[in-house]
Amino acid sequence: MNRFLIALAMSCVLVAPATSQTPKGELKAGAIAHTTESRPLVVSQALVGIPSSLTRGAVYVGPLNAMPATLAPGKVPLVVFLHGSSGLGLKAIGEWQHWLATLGIATIAPDSFALKDRLTYSSPVDKDTYEKVHAMRASEIDIVLEAVRAIPWIDTSRMVLAGTSEGAVPVARYRGDAFIGRIIFSWSCEDNYFVHSHATAIPDNQPTLNIISSTDPYFSRSNSWLGASPAALGHCGEQLKGNKKASVVLVPGAPHTVLMFDQAKAPVEGFLRGLFGI
């Protein structure tokens, strides 16, 4: 693996967790597997970013089912992005998609909340519940792949799989071959409170970028209820150490969402330009 890219010209020191009682999370029971009704909505309600080269005007960021009816001829590379537990309402997601569209890169972020009465939670909850959520999120990769293969303006030979937080777990676990690279935001690829086992399945020859705060409130040692071994790093370095095409970026002192931090955007741009040849 490439030596860690540090966002500042100084070493990042992971903060040791303070001793405290594990807080009680909240769980709102509900549906936890997509249905014949929700599957098409996962895609039609997806948030897409479309470059101006296709719109013949301004970049489009909005629902797939409201995108411009006519696009210019041509194909563009695509990033499939899996949102976190808060859904597509997170402002940074649309901003990130708009930014990538200005680089000539299309994005599609499937809507996990297309499932009526979907289960929701605030951490921590039990691992069995988390794993059911992870399985549902993994199914969304196949749902969106089936759809994008029928979209004429997507170059399916140039696709990257990305996700943040809850959405990053299925990115790390994905075992298919539809994507030429992966971007894992705000997930550490380690055993902790969020999984029974991290089950990372990234081939050692697949380009991969992991970006996370050095003090991530959920997956670094800053979290007093992390539930990880004392050797936990708070990033995917251990799982990527055999991958010479992987990099880990730590953003010092950042919050959980790092999508639009300059220290995250620069490596993402370089990573995608290199993979997509743009």
Residue positions per predicted region:
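The feature captures the conserved acid-bearing segment of alpha/beta-hydrolase catalytic domains
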Residues: 181-249, 256
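N-terminal cap/lid segment of alpha/beta-hydrolase-fold proteins
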Residues: 21-74
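Short beta-strand element of the alpha/beta-hydrolase
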Residues: 74-84
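Cap/lid segment of the alpha/beta-hydrolase catalytic domain
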Residues: 86, 112-135
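Short amphipathic alpha-helix adjacent to the substrate-entry channel of hydrolases
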Residues: 91-108
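C-terminal catalytic histidine-bearing segment of alpha/beta-hydrolase fold enzymes
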Residues: 241-278
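Alpha/beta-hydrolase active-site loop
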Residues: 127-152
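Primarily recognizes the serine-hydrolase "nucleophile elbow" in alpha/beta-hydrolase
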Residues: 144-203
